[in-house]
Structure formats: structure tokens, C-alpha cells
């Protein structure tokens, strides 16, 4: 099996795990467990807490002491146990702590997946800019497949969605141990920053990187809103008679999955845009795309305004990919191998935590 196929499997499962619950869990907690809006928001805020702390710490461990692919696998195995426990939760406190523990080990895997992929592609003399986006697009396909699976089976309204996530996380955790070794960097004459694993913080000394991380924080805030409340927002139209039986209400998760379908197209366009416009222009395009995303989503409805909702989903693909994937590639190019995992962890901490 070629290295590209092996990485495709990894990326597919990585986002299948997330897609099995990320979009639909809020609706399940609101409609079936009767959690209040503030409680749902607090549970999803654990994603920010986990992103603020863990990616950097796990990245440091991968850079200094532990093979990244093994650490990646362990995180998913622990995450599988947490999701299984979350599936049994019926109260707010249970669900909060279960999802916090799950996200503490899941969020670091987003950056570790990139580190493992980049390392494997470099080992096999592949071109990152050319070869990584077509591999990463399978992560989005995995996310879409998970969303459709939980919607069409009716799992979006039950704890079964968490069982799906737990099983797929366990499979990925075991599979990860078969991937090419991504060993810690062995450096001599370590500085004080290196000794404490804080190497990536030196990137803030460079004006270009400091500005990049600032905008990453702002765009990262926009990323979380529809993930948390999108399904609940569309489900709220069920209270309006003319929209109650509409496709957008009955199959809200499938409607939201158009966003991820759009991602698959824009991921493939990233090499072209980076080559012809550069990272600054690509990130600027992303900023404008986010404005249109929320404007269309806010004014649309499942009836005559369905076209605005659909267009909003399509624009999301550009907004997300041009920010998230291009940003990760930019960090990879601007850092050396000794701090690469730490730098990727820092990037995800800023975009998903702050």
C-alpha cells in the first residue's frame, strides 16, 4: 500500500471521528437531553479549553521525547474511551467532563495528523504543496460521510452518534501504530527555551509570524460558531409551521454537510491560489468569505431563503480551507524540523483555543 493511500486512510478516519458528533451533538443535547443553550455552549467551549492547552503540550512531547505517530494513536484510544462514556451521559455534569476529557486528547491530534503526514511525505520525497491537499481532502470526505451516516440513520437525535465516534477513534488509534515513524528531533546544545519545550514561542519574534497568529486567532473565533449552534439554529425553524416539514429542518445535518462538500473542492484549489497569490492574499480572501458565510446564513431560511443557506455552505468551503489548510502549510514552511510539531500545536491552540 502506497504512503499516500495510508495517509488517506488516516485523514479519513481522523475527521470521521469528529464528524460523527461535532455538528449533531448540540441538537441532541438540546432536543433530547433538554440542556439549556448556555450549557450546550459551555460543553462546546471545552474545545477551546482543550485547544488552548493540549496541542502545544502534546506537540512538545512529540518534538522532544515521543514518536508522533505513537502519541497520535494513544490519544485516539483514550478518546474512544471518553466518547463511549459520553454516550452514557444523561446529565450536564457527566457530559461536560466526558467531552472535556475527550477533547483534551482529540484536539492535539489535529496538529499531530499534519505532523505525521508531512513527515511521511518528506520521507518518501513527496512535494508537500502538491501532494498534501489531495490527501487532506479525504479528511473532509470522512467528515461528510460521518454526518450523512448519523443523519440518515437517525443517530443525530440519540447517543448512538457517540458510539460511532468511539468505534472509529479506536480503529484509528490502532491503525496509527502502523504508520511511518516520526521520531523526536535530536538536537545538540539546547537553549533554555528548547529545554522547556517552548521553542515555537520564538516565532512571535518575527513580525510576519506574529501578524499571522493574530489573524489566525480572529478567524478561529468565527470557525466555532456554526459548528456549535448551526444544527440547533436550523432545528429552531421546526417551530414555524411553514418550515416544520422542510428538508432543511428534517435533514439539517445533511444540509450543513454541503459546507464540507465545498471544502473538498477548495482544498484542491489551494496549491493554485498559494502559487499565484501567496499566503497573505489567500488569508484575505478567507476573511471576506467568512463575512459572506455568516451574512447569508443569518438571512436564509429553509423555505424561500434556502438558496442563501446553500450558498452560505458553499462559501464556507473557501472560508475554512483558505484559512485552516493554507495556514498549516505556511507554518510548516516557516519552521524548522526541530520545532515543527510544537509550531503546529501553537497554530491550533491559537485558532481553536483563544
Residue ranges and their predicted role:
Residues 63-76, 275-287:
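Cytoplasmic membrane-interface "Motif A"-like loop-to-helix N-cap segments
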Amino acid at each position: 500500500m502506497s504512503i499516500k493511500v495510508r495517509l488517506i486512510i488516516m485523514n479519513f478516519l481522523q475527521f470521521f471521528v469528529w464528524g460523527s458528533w461535532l455538528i449533531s451533538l448540540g441538537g441532541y443535547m438540546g432536543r433530547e437531553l433538554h440542556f439549556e443553550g448556555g450549557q450546550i455552549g459551555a460543553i462546546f467551549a471545552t474545545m477551546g479549553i482543550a485547544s488552548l492547552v493540549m496541542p502545544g503540550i502534546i506537540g512538545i512531547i512529540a518534538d522532544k521525547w515521543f514518536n508522533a505517530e505513537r502519541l497520535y494513536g494513544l490519544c485516539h484510544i483514550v478518546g474512544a474511551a471518553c466518547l463511549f462514556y459520553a454516550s452514557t451521559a444523561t446529565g450536564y455534569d457527566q457530559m461536560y467532563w466526558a467531552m472535556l476529557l475527550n477533547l483534551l486528547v482529540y484536539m492535539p491530534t489535529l496538529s499531530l495528523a499534519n505532523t505525521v503526514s508531512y513527515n511521511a511525505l518528506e520521507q518518501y520525497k513527496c512535494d508537500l504543496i502538491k501532494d498534501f491537499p489531495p490527501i487532506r481532502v479525504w479528511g473532509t470526505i470522512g467528515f461528510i460521510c460521518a454526518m450523512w451516516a448519523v443523519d440518515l440513520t437517525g443517530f443525530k437525535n440519540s447517543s448512538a452518534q457517540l458510539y460511532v465516534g468511539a468505534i472509529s477513534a479506536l480503529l484509528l488509534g490502532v491503525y496509527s501504530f502502523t504508520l511511518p515513524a516520526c521520531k523526536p528531533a535530536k538536537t545538540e546544545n539546547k537553549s533554555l527555551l528548547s529545554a522547556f519545550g517552548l521553542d515555537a514561542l520564538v516565532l512571535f519574534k518575527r513580525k510576519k509570524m506574529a501578524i499571522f497568529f493574530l489573524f489566525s486567532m480572529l478567524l478561529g473565533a468565527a470557525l466555532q460558531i456554526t459548528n456549535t449552534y448551526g444544527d440547533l439554529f436550523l432545528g429552531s425553524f421546526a417551530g414555524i409551521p411553514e418550515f416544520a416539514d422542510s428538508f432543511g429542518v428534517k435533514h439539517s445535518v445533511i444540509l450543513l454537510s454541503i459546507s464540507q462538500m465545498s471544502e473538498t473542492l477548495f482544498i484542491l484549489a489551494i496549491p493554485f491560489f498559494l502559487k499565484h497569490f501567496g499566503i497573505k492574499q489567500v488569508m484575505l480572501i478567507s476573511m471576506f468569505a467568512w463575512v459572506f458565510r455568516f451574512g447569508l446564513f443569518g438571512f436564509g431560511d429553509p423555505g424561500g431563503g434556502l438558496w442563501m443557506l446553500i450558498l452560505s455552505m458553499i462559501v464556507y468551503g473557501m472560508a475554512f480551507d483558505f484559512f485552516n489548510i493554507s495556514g498549516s502549510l505556511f507554518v510548516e514552511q516557516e519552521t524548522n524540523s526541530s520545532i515543527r510539531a510544537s509550531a503546529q500545536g501553537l497554530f491550533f491552540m491559537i485558532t481553536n483555543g483563544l
